[in-house]
Amino acid sequence: TMEDKKLPEKVILMYDAVIGMLEDGIDLNQMKVIDITKRAGIGKGTAYEYVSSKEELIVGALLYDIQKQFERIIGVITATDGFQSKVERILDWILDNFRECKTFALFARIGMGTYDISEHLQNEMRKAHTKECCVTNTLEQVVDEILECGVKEGILKPVKKELQRMAFGSQILI
């Protein structure tokens, strides 16, 4: 988990500031380091002790927030038995936490190319994507657990995991 990495408190403050700005409707492309650090209650120069660019900070914040959400949903899924119950719990969780799912939806839109971002931000997203992305692994883990449950119960056919993931994801995100 991301908490295992023990992020410095000031990094968490900056990440929370970015997420708060997103929740307030501020576009990623309009965010400035000075506004992020002011909201986080730290000096602008402090940001550059931890990150090399605004884009690295924004992408880090998105990944951090998504990882937190996934850790919560994994808790919900693993505490639930049965395919139908797991799917219902996910849908309930999404409805109950819709505001908090904003980052995930934004991240998905960026990944699918339906949200315009600056070239610098695109480059940072690519860098984050090429690293072993724990967010993707966590999402696959959650989806695979649900799908395996569906196969065991005879609700789903045992087909390629990639196809199952795509079909499941498209139905949940629609």
Explain the meaning of each model-derived region.
Residues 33, 63-70:
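Short, basic, alpha-helical segments at the C-terminal edge of helix-turn-helix-like DNA-binding modules
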Residues 96, 140-149, 157-174:
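Hydrophobic alpha-helical segments that form the core
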Residues 1-39, 56:
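Basic, helix-initiating cap at the start of DNA-binding domains
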Residues 41-51:
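Short hydrophobic/aromatic patch on the recognition helix
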Residues 74-75, 115-153, 166:
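Amphipathic alpha-helical packing segments from all-alpha helical-bundle domains
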Residues 60, 74-103, 168:
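Hydrophobic alpha-helical connector segments
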Residues 53-58, 68-69:
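Short amphipathic alpha-helical segment with a characteristic S/N-K-E followed by hydrophobic residues
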